[in-house]
Amino acid sequence: MPPSSSITQEDKATIRKYIPKSTNKIIAAAVVKLYVAYPDPNKWNYTGLCGALVLSYDTTAKCCWFKLVDVVNNSGIIWDQELYQNMDYRQDRTFFHSFELDKCLAGFSFANETDAQKFYKKVLDKGCHPESIENPVLSFITRKGSSRHAPNNSNIQPPSAAPPVPGKENYNAVGSKSPNEPELLNSLDPSLIDSLMKMGISQDQIAENADFVKAYLNESAGTPTSTSAPPIPPSIPSSRPPERVPSLSAPAPPPIPPPSNGTVSSPPNSPPRPIAPVSMNPAINSTSKPPLPPPSSRVSAAALAANKKRPPPPPPPSRRNRGKPPIGNGSSNSSLPPPPPPPRSNAAGSIPLPPQGRSAPPPPPPRSAPSTGRQPPPLSSSRAVSNPPAPPPAIPGRSAPALPPLGNASRTSTPPVPTPPSLPPSAPPSLPPSAPPSLPMGAPAAPPLPPSAPIAPPLPAGMPAAPPLPPAAPAPPPAPAPAPAAPVASIAELPQQDGRANLMASIRASGGMDLLKSRKVSASPSVASTKTSNPPVEAPPSNNLMDALASALNQRKTKVAQSDEEDEDDDEWD
């Protein structure tokens, strides 16, 4: 028998040696033992055959086979069986599968439950439906099986040890404990077996766990003598909780008597209730050393501790309701500042409630604390978000004061109607953003432009082109700063020059209106180029999204195809 429960690489090599790949397609393989219900159909008998069970598809005969290969002695195929049509292949246990042969039932006991589950799925999907492997006309044998398999089944000789229901523990030691299972079933009381079966436990499970049932009966034999003891123990714990519940309600009377210590004798009216908590709490009360000997003093101590503890628990509503009577006592005991040790003994007095109450209050405060802590940060973040928009307008304002003439130009640029003449000088700064080499060209062009600045008539048409330029200017702030140095001085001189004659002379000297128009035309294509350049920038994101979606769909298709291929590729079984 192979030492490992799964098929190893050596086992695979042995399997391929005796089941050639040229005429067979291996679907699944696992290490098993072969059992048969023969000659007694009510008992499983181990045949002595074990090895690698292979589910293979014969490509020539177009049918599926069970083939048991001896991987220990390398003796080849020691048993085989053809799968007939509509074969009833059952999974009796996670590790044991059975099916019907010509004369008897056969069963496989798997060494590994994972291999058993995979093998079972393969048999149902493809072994019992070979048409799923290939579509041509299939040749199936009848439910009786072929004649050549009958000798194989008849040659199976049951060994001396015959386990009725093979279990996983029987896999390593054949027939060691299995013969005792029927005796254990017979030793159990039939009424007990019937009651267990009514509770949903099958007879096979009872047989497997017969040792445990017997041991459990022996352990519980001290309390009940009858075999119906197993159902009684579960009923005992069910009766104990109700005793604890009244013990919880019992503390209600103790808080009422604390004002008068003579009322301590009142609890003995219900002795079982105080006795139960005392019996449950001696270990815990051992931590509180004072009230050990007298039970009455324990009750009074519990009442006093309850009174001392009631002040802290008021936050939970349930404790308020329960602690209404002791609140008055708590006020009288409020003079006692050090109740930390009593609450511990008090926690022992009432085990379930105080710790639960204590654990309940702490969570709410941390929840409220983080909630309050989280609320201010979003406010501050929102403020921070609102603050960034303010700096951008401040940035042009700060850059403007750096150059006083530029500040005037910006002021003139804000109102469109009174200051259109100041817009033409903005055209030269537009040239540098288009390309850095144009900066030196803008420097010589600056002298003629200042006199043309005050001219308003030709520029109204250029107004729409000017507004988009300012946003482009802030993109390269360092470049425009050195270039407009010369025009800045000229712009500062513009308000000093008065008289239309000088302006006309300067216009003529600069080349006249035609030159200005040509410059306007040259400025407009730059704006158009910026506008046209923007759409292609926006287009790629849309294409990228579509490409990403398409790639995701393709990946999903490939994954699905791979999963299908994994199911179809049965030659490489693992």
Swiss-Prot record:
Compositional bias per record (Pro residues), positions renumbered to this chain: 230-240, 251-260, 352-368, 415-485
Predominant location category: cytoplasm
Subcellular location as annotated: Cytoplasm, Cytoskeleton
Residue numbers bearing the Phosphoserine modification: S386
One GO CC term on file: actin cortical patch
Entry keyword set: Actin-binding, Cytoplasm, Cytoskeleton, Phosphoprotein
Composition bias, Acidic residues: 563-574
UniProt feature, compositional bias: Polar residues: 149-158, 521-545
Occurrences of domain WH2 (ranges): 499-518
Leader peptide range in chain numbering: none
Residue ranges annotated for the WH1 domain, each copy included: 19-130
Gene Ontology MF annotations: actin monomer binding; Arp2/3 complex binding
Residues annotated as transmembrane: none
Gene Ontology BP terms: actin cortical patch assembly; actin filament branching; Arp2/3 complex-mediated actin nucleation; endocytosis; establishment or maintenance of cell polarity; mitotic actomyosin contractile ring assembly; mitotic cytokinesis
Pfam families: WH1
Compositional bias of kind Low complexity: 297-306, 324-335
Region described as Disordered: spans on this chain: 144-186, 221-494, 517-574
Quaternary assembly: Interacts with vrp1.
Function text: Has a role in regulating actin assembly, so regulating polarized growth.
Name assigned to this protein: Actin-binding protein wsp1
Species of provenance: Schizosaccharomyces pombe (strain 972 / ATCC 24843) (Fission yeast)
Taxonomic classification: Eukaryota, Fungi, Dikarya, Ascomycota, Taphrinomycotina
